[in-house]
């Protein structure tokens, strides 16, 4: 696709069921280490739980524990550090008000929190 002039944009969601911090970071590193991937742009969406979804039912049944704001930040900081400069980070969280989510990151300005709290570790 790149040979035809297309830009490649990936979406990456840390915190999905059956993952943990190490697995999320290793998976993201593979996106840039493997020459079959290497996106030009990326959007990071920490897993959020919305009412009426299977994930919501799993959470209510105690079968899934979503990551909270701090856990999401702890996963995204090393991921951001590893993201090459050529790759544009387009988004760090969905622009959906937190009142529509049942669990997960509790801030609408999550990217700002990462920049302020972890600024020495993140490229802006």
Feature map (PLM): residue ranges:
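Charge-rich, low-complexity amphipathic helices
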Residues: 23-24, 64, 101, 111
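General N-terminal targeting signals
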Residues: 25, 59-61, 104-106
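Terminal amphipathic helices with adjacent charged low-complexity linkers/tails
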Residues: 94-123
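Conserved C-terminal portion of the radical SAM core fold
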Residues: 1-55, 69-98
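Alpha/beta catalytic cores of nucleotide-metabolism and tRNA/nucleoside-modifying enzymes
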Residues: 64-74, 122-124
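Glycine-rich tight-turn/loop motif centered on a GG-T
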Residues: 56-66
């Amino acid at each position: 696709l790149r040979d035809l002039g297309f830009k490649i944009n990936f979406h990456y969601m840390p915190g999905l069921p059956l993952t943990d911090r190490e697995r999320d970071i290793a998976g993201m590193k593979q996106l840039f280490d493997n020459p079959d991937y290497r996106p030009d742009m990326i959007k990071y969406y920490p897993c959020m739980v919305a009412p009426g979804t299977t994930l919501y039912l799993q959470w209510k049944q105690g079968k899934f524990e979503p990551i909270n704001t701090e856990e999401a930040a702890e996963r995204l900081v090393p991921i951001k550090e590893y993201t090459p400069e050529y790759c544009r980070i387009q988004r760090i969280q969905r622009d959906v008000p937190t009142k529509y989510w049942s669990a997960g990151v509790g801030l609408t300005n999550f990217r700002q929190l990462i920049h302020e709290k972890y600024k020495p570790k993140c490229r802006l």
